[in-house]
Amino acid sequence: GSSGLISMTRV
């Protein structure tokens, strides 16, 4: 679920 959000925050 939050994987997508973490991906963006990990830029």
UniProtKB/Swiss-Prot annotation:
Cell location: Secreted
Valine amide PTM positions: 11
Keyword Secreted in annotation: yes
Cellular component terms per the entry's GO annotation: extracellular region
InterPro entries: Periviscerokinin
Gene Ontology biological process terms in this record: neuropeptide signaling pathway
Pfam family of the protein (one): Periviscerokin
Transmembrane segments: none
Keyword annotations of the record: Amidation, Neuropeptide, Secreted
Superkingdom, taxonomy of origin: Eukaryota
Family: Belongs to the periviscerokinin family.
Function field: Mediates visceral muscle contractile activity (myotropic activity).
Protein name (record): Periviscerokinin-3
Organism encoding this protein: Therea petiveriana (Domino cockroach)
Organism ancestry: Eukaryota, Metazoa, Ecdysozoa, Arthropoda, Hexapoda
